[in-house]
A protein has these predicted regions:
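A cross-taxon signal for low-complexity, glycine/charged-rich
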Residues: 3-6, 10-15, 19-20, 24-31
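Short, Lys/Arg-enriched N-terminal segments with co-localized hydrophobic residues
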Residues: 29-43
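Hydrophobic alpha-helical elements and their junctions with loops/disorder across both membrane
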Residues: 16, 26-27, 33, 55, ...
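Nucleotidyltransferase catalytic core that binds NTPs
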Residues: 40-199
Length: 199
């Protein structure tokens, strides 16, 4: 069953907490996610923005993107430019890594941007932002950002997707640390992705 068909009853209030648990959600997650997502979400809106620094793009990011594509026809992966911070990989390298990771996915576009994410959404006419969370600390942080974005742009909603358990240990910072120490990346990066050499 697609993610869309599984989560629509959750948004509509038709799915009990016991049923949600059978789909892999804890009771606490069920309540938090239901409150976060119910908003003004319109499932008929077919395009979403998936923003991040993606330095680099990981198997966890790919998991979130793949699941988002079961909800939306198109997801724009937006690589954020932080002028005050030197990235581990250049912008073009990050875009290339994402292109490799998503080569078999339909409906994915990759762009880079600077400035506010909600301003990019307005520019592109996108009404939904997709974010992935690995734990409740991530969730609380994303909820705070989502609430701030709603003040700036009330018509733009954030869709928070919990990372599948097998990817919950993965982060870009962990990948960077492994790269710096020549560690094993097989559980962190899709095996068909070739990362650029670090000079």
């Amino acid at each position: 069953m697609s993610l869309r068909r599984r989560i629509l009853p959750l948004w509509r209030g038709e799915l009990s907490s016991d049923a949600a648990i059978s789909l892999g959600l804890t009771r606490y997650w069920f309540q938090r996610i239901k409150l976060r997502l119910i908003g003004n979400f319109n499932i008929m809106s077919k395009v979403a923005l998936f923003p991040g620094s993606f330095d680099p793009f990981t198997s966890g990011h790919l998991n979130i993107l793949t699941r988002a594509l079961t909800i939306f026809d198109e997801v724009v992966v937006a690589v954020g430019i932080n002028q005050a911070k030197r990235g581990f990989y250049t912008m073009s390298q990050r875009e290339d890594i994402i292109a490799q990771a998503t080569k078999d996915l339909k409906g994915v576009k990759v762009i880079s941007y600077d400035g506010l994410t909600v301003d990019l959404c307005k520019e592109l006419g996108i009404k939904h932002i997709v974010r992935g969370v690995r734990n409740m600390t991530d969730f609380d942080n994303e909820q705070a950002v989502a609430d701030a974005n709603r003040h700036l742009a009330p018509d733009i909603d954030t869709i928070i997707i919990p990372t599948a358990q097998e990817y919950s240990h993965i982060s870009s910072s962990a990948v960077r640390d492994l790269l710096s120490h020549h560690g094993d990346l097989s559980r962190f990066i899709p095996d068909w992705v070739v990362l650029p050499e670090i000079i």
